[in-house]
Regions:
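Residues in well-ordered alpha-helical elements
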Residues: 4, 20, 44-45
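Short, aromatic-enriched amphipathic alpha-helices that serve as compact interaction elements
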Residues: 1-17
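A beta-strand edge to alpha-helix "cap/lid" segment located at domain peripheries
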Residues: 2, 48-118
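A short gly/proline-enriched turn/hairpin at secondary-structure junctions
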Residues: 31-41, 55-56
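Structured beta->alpha junctions
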Residues: 11, 36, 67-69
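Short beta-edge strand/loop motif at the mouth of beta-sheet-based domains
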Residues: 39-49
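Short, well-ordered alpha-helical segments enriched in acidic and aromatic residues
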Residues: 16-31
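Hydrophobic alpha-helical core bundles mediating ligand binding, dimerization, or RNAP-core interactions
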Residues: 7, 14, 26, 51, ...
Length: 118
């Protein structure tokens, strides 16, 4: 898979709200910075625990890719993440930076607009 295909598959997996599918493209040694006030998670087990926590309080997750750019193994996404999170609808516009090695994401950093900016 190309880096773009890996990232697209990862983002599509979120619609399932299935932690196994979401984690299928995450490397054992990956780092994940989900934005907002969340900490950086490091390593497969720590990231999986975070993902399980996120999907536990979601009843919907649709991710619209507005723009996507690839430079080598880095994929940049402009997105709108549309969620029902803790019973509340949320449209979260933002950017993501993904570093990909082979068919795994080794680093994922998200940057979202604050509510005051949207």
């Amino acid at each position: 898979m190309t880096p773009e295909e890996v990232v697209r598959a990862e983002l599509e997996a979120w619609a399932s709200l299935d932690a196994d599918k979401i984690m299928a493209y995450i490397a054992d040694h990956a780092t994940f910075l989900p934005g907002f006030s969340f900490p950086t998670y490091s390593g497969f087990k720590e990231i999986r625990k975070a993902m399980e926590g996120f999907v536990k309080v979601m009843t919907k997750c649709d991710i619209e890719i507005v723009n996507l750019a690839v430079v080598g193994n880095v994929v940049l996404t402009e997105r709108v993440d549309r969620l029902i999170f803790d019973g509340k609808p949320v449209d979260a516009p933002g950017m993501g930076a993904f570093e990909v090695s082979g068919d795994k994401i080794t680093a994922w950093r998200d940057y979202f607009y604050s509510a005051a900016d949207t």
